[in-house]
């Protein structure tokens, strides 16, 4: 039985500290009690490509407190999921708002989340989850995700001597 996690980043850390053989079962265990895991993983690796209507990266004006211990954020991804998923739904009332107001709503969600969860959902929005959790790529096929965005590796520059 999986331990209960308040934050999704804690659950994912628990999943990927296990040996590779156990990671799939641990992720499924976490997903059985948290409805946000499956869509977050699918969107984060690029298997689903919704239009978030938001600029890339963390908002520059975000006042994220990074000195708060795990489990002590004002809110969590689970609690905010209903609001977050509206950014991906083209028929949501949120999409009727001007872009600056949508960004303001996103900013208020980011500032309420724990800093690690804010980084996690930003990586999901930008389809960069594999950069945050590189071990996830090894188990995607076991999860049934075959079409995803592979992370672009850093190219080493050749020096001419």
What is each of the regions a protein language model found here?
Residues 1-161:
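N-terminal nucleic-acid-engaging modules of covalent nucleotidyltransferase systems
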């Amino acid at each position: 039985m999986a331990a209960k996690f308040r934050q999704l980043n804690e659950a994912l850390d628990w999943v990927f500290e296990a040996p590779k053989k156990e990671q799939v079962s641990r992720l499924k265990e976490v997903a059985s009690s948290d409805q946000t895991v499956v869509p977050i993983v699918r969107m984060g690796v690029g298997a689903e490509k919704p239009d978030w209507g938001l600029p890339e990266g963390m908002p520059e004006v975000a006042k994220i407190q990074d000195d708060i211990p795990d489990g002590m954020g004002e809110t969590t991804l689970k609690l905010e999921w209903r609001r977050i998923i509206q950014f991906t739904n083209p028929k949501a009332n949120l999409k009727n708002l001007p872009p600056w107001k949508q960004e303001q709503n996103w900013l208020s969600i980011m500032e309420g989340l724990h800093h690690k969860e804010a980084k996690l959902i930003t990586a999901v929005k930008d389809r960069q989850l594999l950069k945050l959790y590189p071990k996830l790529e090894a188990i995607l096929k076991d999860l049934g995700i075959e079409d995803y965005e592979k992370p672009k590796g850093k190219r080493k520059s050749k020096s001419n001597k």
